[in-house]
Amino acid sequence: MERKVFVKKGISVFLFCAVCALPFFAEWNSFDIPDSAEIRRQVSREWFEGSLDVVRGLNSEIRSNQVGTQFQIRLEEQQDIFLVIAAPKSQMKVDIYEGGGVRAAVEDSYNIDSPGAWILARSKQNGSPLSVRYCFAKDAGVYVQFRPNQDGRTSLADMIIFDSYAARGVPLGVPFETFYTASFAQIQALTKNNLPWASVQPKAGLYDGALVMVQTIRENLPNIVSEDDAAYNEEGLPVFINNGQSRYVPQEVRQKLTLSSNGFVKWICDGIVEPLAGSYLKLKPLVQPTVNVNPTGAKGVLAAKYSANFSLDWTRNLAAAVLSVRNNKTLLYKDSGVDVSVEPFATRWTDKGFQNAAGYIANTGYRMQYLKPLLYVLATVNPQYFYLAAIRQTAKGSVGNETGVFNDSAAIFPYFDADGKFKAIVFFDGVEYSLQQFCSLYGKAGDIFVHLTRVKATAKFYPQEPAKEKKND
């Protein structure tokens, strides 16, 4: 027992010494962001340890680090806390209105959430430190923070991605005050085995296939008309999805493609498959059930008239079919591994406080409000993929009972742009949306789920064009 206690203390001492042994003001880090460690050491006593009244009496300062990057040290007050901020200088494009005209200009700014910003939060009531935040990503909602442990001697680490905690309360054997002067490189070294850094480091240059697909789809959107139950078969002929029968296309839209939301995602997958196989995907394998339904349950009764899992089956079978063509080997859905079922988060911060992250629910997917942080991680960890999304909504039965049904589907392309900022393009029912716009289509309904299946993106993408549509009278 004594040995275990000794080892635990030894680890704490080792971690503390490891932090101190690093070059104290290391400027370079793997995210290549500016660092204020040297500046923070110079101002620590006044700005970080002084009372609120003392800090209020200090003027904002502009100081330069060893490589010449300027930081502004300043105070900001909120209702119950006050913040001491070390923010790096950046430039912001602005429009200046003067003399009846507008001219573009560039102004210096010191944003609280810029990559390289450092924020100390303290209580107004007693001045006690609450947290230190390091901003390192181009997206303001992605950061790492440290909090004092209840023992008063050590600290806890959190990693946050858009209000979802990839790690929360990870114990570290160093005093909280370490983070007053620790560089970003030092805190990376300290937490490299404790925090999921791989989930927040974008892979530059690996999104080309997805971006080619996005641009090609975008260029074809003017030629797509939304129509219920509409798709094209393996020969490029218009058919009904429900029964595979030939579908009449009115003369006024003959020069366009008529597609339902499910036909639209098939059209995208066909654009991957046709260059490899010489034809489009057959419909019949795409409607095969992937979920065993209790025939006496609500879904079983509904299934007698309509498939409650239609777009779930459709997207799963589509992803498996694309994988089969690529591998030149028939893979059924159950053997394909195309479902996204990762659980990258433990908790989520909401208006009601911390809540356990619902995560993945089998044959249901993820809550829609969970999509943004999830897609951020997927874009980081699996940069060469896009996702087919089956959308689950709640339908009320004739006797007032509620059943989840999968009617529609979409294609989602998450990526990081040239500046390292996270983006997600959604193509749904022949229309392009940002992720925020797409989620807004469903309001704030908490019962919307999205089930994802992965498909590898490719620059060799040639979807069916209206001119190639065979006449079907």
Kindly give the residue locations of the regions a language model identified.
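Bacterial N-terminal signal peptides that target proteins for export
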Residues: 2-14
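Bacterial N-terminal signal peptides
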Residues: 12-23
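Cysteine-nucleophile amide-bond enzymes
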Residues: 26-473
